[in-house]
Every structure is written in structure tokens, then in C-alpha cells.
């Protein structure tokens, strides 16, 4: 499971590092097999409130949207190298 916010972030990264050809491959070969949760206004607002209230500068809106979505869906494990997911109480793979 991923969110449309993560897709936007990923597209920007792929385009910047690998170019438009890689974006086409990503869109045609990878996106169709993903379960995508489309973020609504309520989740966006809740995540933004966390960002605004956060004591640290490096807390991203995309990460906060992911945390909120995972909690709402009962997801406890994340495939990520981002240590912030562990700080938020999620199990991270690879460990």
C-alpha cells in the first residue's frame, strides 16, 4: 500500500535522477501493481497539523500522511529505510 502523495514524491525523485524514460517505466510497469490510497481532505488536514506542531524541522508532510493513513488502515509494518517510521511505532522492513 502507498499513497498518492508518495507517488508524487517518487515521480519527482525518479524524474530528477533518471529522466522521463524512467517515469514512463514507473507509470506503466510499477504503478499498476500498487494499492494506492488516495488522500482526502481530512487525512491531509490531520497530517498538516502534526507537521505544524512537530518540534523538529525534518518531519515531512508526505511522511505524516503515510503515518496517518497507516494508522487508519491498521497497517503496522512499513517497507522503508526511513528511521522516522520506527520512531512512530511501526515495524520497518528491512530491519
Regions found by a protein language model. Give the residues of each.
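PIN-domain endoribonuclease scaffold, especially VapC-family toxins
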Residues: 1-56, 68, 87-92
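Acidic, metal-associated active-site segment
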Residues: 60-76
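Acidic active-site catalytic centers that drive phospho-/nucleotidyl reactions
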Residues: 9, 63, 82
